[in-house]
Every structure is written in structure tokens, then in C-alpha cells.
Amino acid sequence: MEFTVSNVNLRDLARIFTNLSRIDDAVNWEINKNQIEITCLNSSRSGFSMVTLKKAFFDKYIFQPDSVLLTGLMTPTIRIRTQVKPILSVFRNKIFDFIPTVVTTNSKNGYGSESASRKDVIVENVQISISTGSECRIIFKFLCKHGVIKTYKISYEQTQTLHAVFDKSLSHNNFQINSKILKDLTEHFGQRTEELTIQPLQERVLLTSFTEEVVHNRDILKQPTQTTVSIDGKEFERVALNEGVSVTLSLREFRAAVILAEALGSSICAYYGVPGKPILLTFAKGKNSEIEAQFILATVVGSDEQEVSSMMGNRWQHSSTPASLFNSVERNNSLTAVAHNPPGSIGWQTDQSDSSRMFNSALDRSDETNGIKEPSTTNDAGQSLFLDGIPNESELAAFNNDVNDDAEFGPTQAEQSYHGIFSQED
């Protein structure tokens, strides 16, 4: 079993792992004969993300796994789990070298010469394989010029995967916008800001954050701080929203989705119904959507929004892009194609209490039904078994600098209630 990624796609692969690391310190791999799905679920189980790499994304895709790893009857699938930090370190190492070459071309029309730069990439591709037996490793093998091969082995464990189920038929509010615009706007919010509110108002969309905590027990913020940025309705490629329906979600996961969409050069689509129901963020890259990404995030319900209706307020909509372009993301979105809960799925909703207890208890019931006990990630003292944990913002920024500035991966191609639904795979 072997998957080969060309140097053209290495940058995208690195960015995928970088942004997934903002959500959790581990990722799940779900591999079948047609695609690889990389998923993760945050610690509070209020945010789920999945990136799908289609077969066309790879230069070579050979799916001949050891029968020990296979699960599922209809579609044989491999399900494994790896820590994300070792993967980041693989791509962060200085294993790429570029030799700039200046090419001068004399112009035929007499206007002088034109200079262009070319970069000679030493790493030609990376081969990804999975070993079984006494050494359970996922292997990254970088093939370089002059016959140099760099090999990195990362431990994995077999796992059961959870998939979020999103009912798109209940999403009366949706929009599509250039991800670069959203990324620029989210930079106005501090890194320690936890929540973001999306509110349509008079053919504009307001993004609001509210900070009232003191930083590091110092009296830096003596007064609460509210930051609001406004997006003109004309900035959207497509929009259909009900005024009066605002949703509040985690800024960290929202920012991870926006940064990844901007890095891939894709517009981002959002779908949601009412506060308390999940919001879906989705985008794709490639002519045939070789890369697809979906982020499903829980939203918060305030005390004054318990009776809100999805149809309240004025509704405004417009489109500056052909409907076929907008709908292509929907057709290629395997996650949101589920209209109703499939058999064996579990949906839940809490009262205004402890959200983490709700998510844990719901998934624990699912595991007990299937006879599966989720492995513990803490010791008896309650300390994490993973020493480093999730990368902090400075580590991620350093990695992004390696990817963007050093160009080491080759050229780039153009209180409260929560609601969530997860289905247990066979």
C-alpha cells in the first residue's frame, strides 16, 4: 500500500496538518480504495473537521492493505490514529532546497529584456505507506535529487472514527465569500478571543467578539472590550440570510477553517439554521475537488435566543456567481449529503449546563453500545499522557513561516446550549 504526493501538492498537505493541529493534538486517517479522509475532533467535542484527499490528488494511489487493518464490509477501510506534532516536524525539517536561477529573455519588440526566476526543487515527491506487524508505523519517504532518500516513521494505533452528521435541509442561512476577506477580518480579533458572533443586519454581516477576562492575572483589561467588523453584502459571492438570526461559535476552530481555505485559494461556504444548531463551513480545491474540507462547529444559545425562529426578520439574498459554481461544492460534499440521521447515529442537545459532560456522555453511550471503550489520554493524576499537547500559536506561526517564507514545499497551486450529531462507523 503506497500513496505518492508530488512536490506541487506538498505545500497543501503541510497546510492541512498545520490547521488541523489547531483543533486537536491527534488526527484520524480513514483510507479506502478511492480516497483518504483525515479527521479530528476537539477536546470539548464541539468542533469536528474532515479533509478528504481524492485519488486524483496523488501521483500514485495503491490500496492493497494488510487484512489485519481492514474494517467495514461494504467498503473495506483502514482506520488509524496518529499524533499530529511528529507529522508537523517531518514537514518542518529543512529537507527541501531551492536554487534560484535568473533567466534573461531578449524582447523581440525592442522594449528591453525580461527577467524571471526559477526554483529548482530537490525533493521530487513523498511516498506514504503503512507498515504492520511488530512495527506499526506510518512511513514518509522523501525522494530527493541525486538518489537521496529521507525516511521518517511515526507510530499509529487502530481506532474507531466518529463522523459528524449535518442536516443541510434545516440550514436556511448560507453564504459564500472569498476566504481572503474573512482571513483579513479575523486578524482584528486577538489570539485569546474565544468566541465569535455572526449577525446579519441591514444587508451587512457583523462579526463581533467580546473580551472581559484579565490576561495572566494582570489588570490589562480593566474594562470589557468588544470588537466588531462589518462586511458589506456586496462582498459575498452568494448570500441568503435571515436578519435577526445570529450565531456564536468558537473563534479558534473558525479561524482554522478560514486560514486553510485561504491557503488553498478557495472560497468558503457556510450553512446554519438557528442558534444552538451546528454550523457547517466547507470548501474545495481543484477542478474535480481533489481536496475537500468540512468543519462542523457547535453554536451557543443565549438566554434571549431560546425561542428564535429560523424565519424571523427580513431575508436578503443575492448572488454574483453562477449557481452551478456554488452548487458544485454541495454535490462534492460527502459530509453534508446526509439529509437525516443514519441508523445507529446519536443526536443530542443539552440544557444550559456543562457542555463537555454532554458531549462525553453521548459518545460514551455510543461506545458502550458498540462494546468499545475509548482509550484514556490522561493518567491517574489527570495529567495528559502527551507531553507537548496541542501546538501553541507561536509554534504554528513558526511552521507557517517555514512553509510560506522559505517556500520549501515547491510551487503553490492557484450560559449556553450546544447541539451536535455524530455517527459511529462500523
From Swiss-Prot:
The keyword DNA damage applies. Residues 402-426 are annotated as: Disordered. InterPro entries: DNA_clamp_sf, Rad9, Rad9/Ddc1. Transmembrane segments: none annotated. It comes from the Eukaryota. GO terms for molecular function: protein kinase activator activity; signaling adaptor activity. It holds the Pfam family Rad9. Residues 1-147 are annotated as: Required for DNA repair function. GO terms for biological process: cellular response to ionizing radiation; DNA repair; DNA replication checkpoint signaling; mitotic DNA damage checkpoint signaling; mitotic DNA replication checkpoint signaling; mitotic intra-S DNA damage checkpoint signaling; telomere maintenance. Keywords: DNA damage. Gene3D superfamilies: 3.70.10.10. GO terms for cellular component: checkpoint clamp complex; chromatin; chromosome, telomeric repeat region; cytoplasm; cytosol; nucleus; site of double-strand break. Belongs to the rad9 family. Acts in DNA repair and mutagenesis. Involved in promoting resistance to ionizing radiation and UV light, as well as regulating cell cycle progression after irradiation. Repressor of entry into mitosis that is activated by chromosome breaks. This is DNA repair protein rad9. It comes from Schizosaccharomyces pombe (strain 972 / ATCC 24843).
